[in-house]
Amino acid sequence: MKHQRSMLKNYKDLKVWKKSYELCLEIYRITAKFPKEERYGLTSQIRRSVVSIPSNIAEGYGRKTTKDYIRMLYISYGSVCELETQILLAGDLDLIEKGELGTLKKDIAEIERMLKALIKSLENKPLNP
């Protein structure tokens, strides 16, 4: 049950992958300003969560079946939820400026919507033999 990749050449053509990759870059810039004592705490946790999002999208895209692809997208979705919680915590601890926090929350919500839509579209497609 292979999944069709339609007109996309590779996972880097997916809008949700592009958006989540851009979020990775932004998160790395922001967390670079976190206090040194957070290096192995919240900084590390946030970075792991955000990197997991585009990484699992890419891995899922490379899988052989639609079922595997969807499973990896759900893992990415879980990472988005994890990241959102960590970003809220960092904001409440005043580690992220209010303006940056608002932008991050908006970007995270958009990625969440995009992932839900992609998952739904794949779940509603008939599987190839």
Where are these regions (language model features)?
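Short, C-terminally biased terminal segments at protein or domain edges
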Residues: 1-59, 63-129
